[in-house]
Amino acid sequence: MNTKIINVTKRDGRTEPFDLEKVHRVLEWATTDIAAVSISEIELRANIQLYDKIPAYDIHELLIKSAAELISEATPNYQYVAARLVNYKIRKDVYNQHEPWPLVDIVVENVSKGVYDGAIMDNYTRDELNQLDNYIKHDRDDTFTYVGMEQFRGKYLVQDRRTKTLFESPQILYMLVAATLFSDYPKETRLKWVKDYYDDISTFGTSLPTPIMAGVRTSTRQFSSCVLIESDDTLESINATAT
């Protein structure tokens, strides 16, 4: 990569010397155990778009773009590299670190911000949330393709649609969807139902509609995008209802 880049602009406006090794570490992580991909190819594609005082945010987006541009019929595995890079960005944006926070901390934080439904805290004890947290398999994020992870980032993860601020990562979404849907089940058995359903949806065994993926667990409590419309059994009534 272009080592002549002098400074990178951080989120708080500070500048610091461009750290090539940091880029290497991220790409090494993103390509671990993925065959037929090249760190240097990704770096070369990103190199021509770097400039002095580039925002740190843009550097990571360039890496994502560079990996995505290498996806082809001959080199399909770059779709998993690009997906990991998107997921890395999601976690940094949400948690300011690569490791997700404990589930209970995420729930408390997002309920306080008004983006999660407070009923989650009413329906589940901290101990129950901790049990669910211990069951979450964050490494399942590695099974996403680039297209799938971008769809999560842009469509399904709870976020401020105006500022694009994200409040969760994929496995948190899956676990809280399961927890919300089974919240009224008997307390003696519901954690098993939640875990089983989490396993099903987080391994793509069942595909959920957008309203459930994006709305369940939030204050909107949206479960469906369908609307029931009633009309009489006459052509005039049907036409009037449709308009």
Where are these regions (language model features)?
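Extended catalytic cores of very large enzyme megasubunits
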Residues: 1-243
